[in-house]
UniProtKB/Swiss-Prot annotation:
Pfam (any one): PH
Ranges where the PH domain occurs: 10-113
Protein's name in the database: Guanine nucleotide-binding protein alpha-3 subunit
Source organism: Dictyostelium discoideum
Region (G1 motif): 147-160
GO cellular component entries: cytoplasm; heterotrimeric G-protein complex
Lineage: Eukaryota, Amoebozoa, Evosea, Eumycetozoa, Dictyostelia
Length: 570
């Protein structure tokens, strides 16, 4: 006999139902109450106890699944039963008819979808996990190592997750790491400004004369800086930076006669000639025009290669070469002034920045430019947020161990997300405890760097599809981080997700848009309907650069992973 689906209850659902005890024949009649929007289903001895709000027990609904409990004369002497299962316990409840059974199953399913994990549930779960680990004799003197595979497309925020783990469980970054990231931040900032100049030139964007003058001076300096940075190799260039070709190509000229458009006035000189001819800039920010000044490559101005002094990088011997040695001496004050002048132009912050999205500009560029006065100081040392915002392409595989509260070691394997790197993933699928998949939901209107054609969010969805349905790990838990919600909120103000999902007909609110994207990801899991098809997928909306919110998310993830793997250690 077919039954029509029961609509979600709009009012409290109440009924006397039988609950099975520890013994098959031990059934107790209880008054079950399910309120709309509640994260619990409560049961009482009778109406009096309900009025006094003295429940006999509670059935938590967060992370729970409900299904029909099939009648069997051996294991269940009653018909029309349903089973409500949590991670550690299950309830078998008998209803009075098939219609009532379906009504309660559907009502509980709808309640599960909106249920939230309360502090009480979190505390109970955490205590249960700690107790079981302490009682596990096999691991009394051994901390288990749980392997997490960190996957996702390029620039989704995977490496930022690892950085947050360092902050939370490695007591931050070492001096060597801070020095590396300081140089990386300089590169991100300087290359970001160069790309904005490239955008102005390519799109013939009109700008004020003051900004134009600062751009010309910055461009002249940047061309020599890049040549020297590339010559010095990895020490000065920890990433394979994509330099805008119009900044380096001195032969290309903009024929626009408008004085407010950007032109290249180098006259086809090589970088070495520019080095000799350009204005001699001193590190204290003064400008000294001296056509007879010695070449920076000469004996009197050799490149500084001594040990880095992070407390006094501005201490200079007066060599013109130091103006290009950003790693050892920081960004020269006069270059900082040029950058400030360019960035303070409203046209640059609005029209140019918007156009730059088409050129795959680093998402952190705006943040660094807003902080240019602080970053441009000779004594600059990066704070955690600066490091979290830094961007370098991950090549190959990076494994990092984190001891979490002495309970467990998480071995996070960060694998490069670019298309050409994904073939390496298969080598790390063995012994995987869980997969953490990071998807940048703000990329719904962006194209892949690899082909400048494929929509980034579609690429992420397709990749998630292939991973969560891979036969290599059919029962492996998958933690889905729907990342960069801060950038997603901002982008929604000007662009609807309809550009990526033509079938979407909702408004541009964060709640509806993010929920639609979430459902698109969860629907990729095959092998069942409803909640049963998502048994091993746990999702979180994240901002990986926000340490406080990320700590809350990771604590929840930690409990899920540990509880799911306890059986392997017991």
């Amino acid at each position: 006999m077919d039954f029509n689906p029961v609509p979600p209850p709009r009012e409290t659902l109440r009924a006397y139902l039988s609950k099975k005890g520890h013994v098959v024949k031990n059934w107790k009649l209880r008054l079950f109450v399910l309120k709309p929007g509640s994260s619990y289903m409560e049961y009482f001895v009778d109406e009096t106890k309900e009025q006094q709000h003295l429940p006999q027990g509670r059935v938590p609904l967060y992370g729970t699944r409900v299904m029909e409990y099939v009648y069997n004369s051996n294991n269940n002497p009653r018909e029309f039963c349903l089973s409500v299962e949590t991670e550690n316990k299950n309830w078998i409840i008998s209803t009075g008819s098939k219609a009532q059974q379906l009504e309660w199953i559907e009502a509980i399913k709808h309640a599960i979808e909106s249920a939230v994990e309360t502090d009480e549930i979190k505390l109970q779960k955490h205590k249960s996990i700690e107790k079981q680990l302490q009682l596990d004799g096999k691991n009394k003197n051994k901390i288990p190592v749980l392997k997490l595979l960190l996957l996702g497309t390029g620039e989704s925020g995977k490496s930022t997750v690892v950085k947050q783990m360092k902050i939370l469980h490695h007591k931050g970054f070492s001096k060597e790491e801070e020095e590396f990231y300081r140089n990386l931040i300089y590169i991100n900032l300087l290359d970001g400004m160069a790309l904005l100049i490239h955008v102005i030139k390519e799109n013939n964007i009109e700008i004020p004369q003051e900004t134009l003058s600062a751009i010309k001076n910055y461009s002249s300096w940047y061309r020599v800086y890049i040549e020297k940075r590339n010559k010095n190799g990895i020490r000065n260039n920890p990433i394979g930076s994509m330099i805008p070709i119009s900044i380096l190509n001195n032969n290309k000229d903009n024929n626009n006669s408008n004085s407010s458009s950007l032109k290249n006035n180098s006259g086809g000189s090589s970088s070495s000639e520019l080095d000799k001819k350009m204005t001699h800039l001193s590190l204290d920010g003064s400008t000294c025009i001296n056509s007879n000044s010695a070449s920076p490559n000469g004996p009197s101005s050799s490149t500084t290669t001594s040990t880095i002094n992070t407390h006094n990088r501005s201490n200079s011997d007066g060599s013109s070469n130091n103006i290009f040695n950003v790693q050892d001496f920081g960004i020269p004050p006069i270059i900082t002034n040029y950058i400030s002048t360019i960035w303070s132009d409203p046209v640059v912050q609005s029209e140019v920045m918007l156009q730059a999205q088409k050129y795959h500009i680093n998402e952190s560029t705006q943040y660094y430019l807003n902080e240019i006065k602080r970053i441009g100081k000779p004594t600059y040392q990066p704070v955690n947020l600066d490091i979290l915002k830094s961007r370098a392409t991950t090549n190959g595989v990076v494994e990092t161990d984190f001891n979490v509260n002495g309970e467990v070691i998480f071995r996070i394997v960060d694998v490069a997300g670019q298309r050409g790197e994904r073939k390496k993933w298969i080598n790390f699928f063995d012994d995987v405890t869980a997969i953490v998949f990071v998807a940048a939901i703000n990329e719904y209107d962006q194209k892949l760097v690899e082909d400048n054609c494929t929509n980034r969010l579609h690429e992420s969805l397709n990749l998630f599809d292939s991973i969560c349905n891979d036969s290599t790990f059919p029962k492996t838990s998958i933690i889905l981080f729907l990342n960069k919600i801060d950038l997603f909120r901002e982008k929604l103000k000007r662009t609807s997700i309809n550009i990526c999902f033509p079938d979407y007909n909702g408004d541009q609110s964060y709640e509806k848009s993010s929920n639609y994207i979430k459902n698109n990801f969860l629907s990729k899991k095959k092998g069942g309907n409803g909640i049963n098809s998502q048994n091993f997928i746990y999702f979180h909306f994240t901002c990986a650069t926000d340490t406080k919110s990320f700590e809350t998310v990771f604590n929840s993830v930690r409990d899920i992973i540990i509880s799911k793997t306890l059986e392997f250690y017991c």
